[in-house]
Amino acid sequence: MANPILEQAKENMEKAEASLRRTLGQIRAGRANASLVNRVNVEYYGAMTPLNQIAAITIPEARVLLITPYDKGALEDIEKALYTADIGISPANDGSVIRLVIPQLTGERRKEIAKEVGKEAELAKVVVRNARRDAMDNLKKAEKASEISEDEMHDLEEQVQNLTNEATKKIDAISKDKEKEITEG
């Protein structure tokens, strides 16, 4: 796969898959998961610092996330950052640690979250289709400019289509796994 058009298409499709994994990792499934607070930044000594750099994040129980700051003076800053991060869970500060108790999901809420997962998967598929379209357009331009032969173009188009099919299957699998996790939660 030495063709730069093909490599660019593959890279864009892999980015769509990685982005979907990150996004779905932040969707709560009724269980504690450290990824819920991955993107929380805390103002610590005047600088925005990722939460995981100033506190230990553990999961002592299935639905409890425990945040233990390395510096007890940062406790209130962490609590404030969790409130402003809008993660949908109110932090409980007991003076030395912060607990995030994930509420039990109702059947209706599970369905809503499963729909959200489906929407995110569809957005990832759109990115994959756009990468495919761009690659096909670039192949046609290269063929018109006599950079590649017609036979090479058809071979490369087939490879782009195979990459697209593979990326779509991966996205479907990721989506199905997350939906299963949510509905069985």
Curated annotation (Swiss-Prot):
It is found in: Cytoplasm. Residues 167-185 have a biased composition (Basic and acidic residues). Responsible for the release of ribosomes from messenger RNA at the termination of protein biosynthesis. May increase the efficiency of translation by recycling ribosomes from one round of translation to another. The keyword Glycosyltransferase does not apply. GO terms for molecular function: ribosomal large subunit binding. GO terms for cellular component: cytoplasm. HAMAP family: RRF. Pfam families: RRF. The gene is frr. It comes from the Bacteria. Keywords: Cytoplasm, Protein biosynthesis. The keyword Protein biosynthesis applies. GO terms for biological process: translational termination. This is Ribosome-recycling factor. Residues 163-185 are annotated as: Disordered. It comes from Latilactobacillus sakei subsp. sakei (strain 23K) (Lactobacillus sakei subsp. sakei). Gene3D superfamilies: 3.30.1360.40, Ribosome-recycling factor.
